[in-house]
Every structure is written in structure tokens, then in C-alpha cells.
Amino acid sequence: MIDVTFLGTVSGIPSLERNHPAIVLEYSSDERHFLLFDCGEGTQKHLMRSGISFMKLQKIFISHWHADHFSGLIPLIQTMNLEKRREELQIYGPEAERFVSNILDLGYFGLRFPVAAMNVPFSGEEPTLVDSNAEYEVWSIPVFHTVPSVAYLFKEKDRLNINLEKIKELGLKRGTWMKKLKTDGVATVGGKKIKIEDVSDVKPGLRVVYSGDTKPCANVVKLAKGADLLIHDGTFLEEDEGKAHADVRQAAKVAADAGVKQLVLTHLSRRYSTKEDIQEIETAARKIFPETKVAYDFMKVKLKN
């Protein structure tokens, strides 16, 4: 299960209603994992208000190094340090080693815990695997912005579910051997070796894509193919050629082209402050991609397989 919490949903200048960009993705399976995507000003306070412990954050993925997307890192790291964190914090992003080093120099932290900076490629047209464990993967791909910037894909790993009909077809009966099959991937029944893939169906993992700041681009479409949720830059209602951002119709077109299940628009300009503004944005986007929502601070999206 995946819980996505939007901590900040405005673009470059914050408003009283909207904080700078930050999104928490909580993944619950055999273990609980807390990942933060971007960390704008005020992120730690919104973490507190949301009831999510910043001490549980294991990894932070920065899309790019504009201040509205990373300026919350300095106070967040300081608070973790004051709260006597000991676990390593991993920070990913384009040129992360350089920027994280500068951030740590600025803070005079005297860190009691390790902070690891992980560089993410910011050129090319193919996704790159940047993080992986037994339960999920995180991929990145470069996008179109004024500075090196990337989109991220969180991908739950596919699972095998035992199909009882396939077991019957092999003339087998349910038994304790099935537990060994799940644990080891293979079991011997009546002198016959059974592999788990012989009696299982593949259950595709959940997929969430975060575009970061970008104009509409083919790389996001590629990364988001068939995703359960696409979180996309929707800064403007109307196209603005002078800005390296998407308008809401362009974002909806990306969602349609990628064949995603849901689209959430975020990174809205502060000019859109009324209910009527949000309704106009939703109406415009839904004409192209009906399953569209506009994010607001503390909004939650739950995904289940």
C-alpha cells in the first residue's frame, strides 16, 4: 500500500494556503518506508502538522536545486541532529554531492549521523535506476527545465501470488510445502520439484511518478507509462512560453499519452487562490484527462493493489 501526502503544492512564491513543494511517499509492505520528494521551505513544520515523523524519513529525492525545492533541507537536517538521529539519511538529486556538501557547510551542524549524497544523471533519454531494495525501486529521468532537473518513478516490485487452480492442474494438493515454496521459491512434492513461477501469477507493483518542474516532455511520458499515479507540474492555467513549466492542459496531455490511472496537478502558481480558480483548472484538465485532481497542502492519495 502507498500513501502519498502533499506537504507543499505552490510554485516559486508561497502563499498563506500553500507551502513550497514537498511530497511524502509512505510504502507499507513487509516494512514501512518513508521517502520525501523535494523539501521546500517549511517542510518540517508541515511534517509535524501531518503527523509524519521526520525521524522516519530514510531518503530524500530532490528534483532540482531551485530554492523552493530544497531550502527546507537545512532546518530539517538540523532538527534531526538536535533530536539525536543516528540512522543514515540519503539525499538524491542532480549534482547532489556538490549541493549537499554546500548545505552541510552552511549549517555548522556538527552532525551526529551520516548524510550520504547520491548523484542522479541529468542528461539522456532513458530512465536510470538510482535506488533499489527487496521491495521497491526508484528510477529517474532528465526533464525540461531551466536548470538540471529530473523526474522520479517509485516502483513497487512485482510479486508472485500462488494460483490454486494451477496447483490443481498439476495434480497437487494444498499443504505445508506451499510455505516452503513461498520462502525458498522451490519445493519438492512427491519427488517432483515445483518452482514458484510454475504455480503463480505475477501481480504488478504500484507505480508513482513525480515530474518535478518541467515543460511537457517525452521523457516524462516514457517514465510514466501505465503508472498508477502521475504527479505533474501544473503551474499555469494557460500556456506561458516564457516559463519552463507545464500548463494544466499540457500536463493532462502527458497523462493521457502515458496511459496513467490518475493525475494530480501540483506546483500551482500563487495567482490561483480561489475555489473558482481550482474548479477552472480541474475543468480544463479533465476535458483532456478525466481522472485529474488538483493538489492542496495535506491532501492524501492512497493506492492499493
Which residues make up each language-model segment?
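Conserved beta-strand hairpin/beta-sheet module of binuclear metal-dependent hydrolase folds
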Residues: 1-52, 86-88, 152-154, 200-211, ...
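Short internal beta-strands
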Residues: 89-96, 261-265
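Active-site metal-binding motif and surrounding structural segment of the metallo-beta-lactamase
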Residues: 41-92, 119-121
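Metal-dependent catalytic neighborhoods of phosphoester/phosphodiester hydrolases
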Residues: 72-80, 102, 273-283
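Active-site-proximal loop/helix segment associated with metal-binding centers of metalloenzymes
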Residues: 15-17, 131-223, 229-231
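A glycine-rich helix N-cap at a beta->alpha junction
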Residues: 107-121
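Active-site metal-binding loops of divalent metal-dependent hydrolases
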Residues: 9-10, 40-42, 65, 96, ...
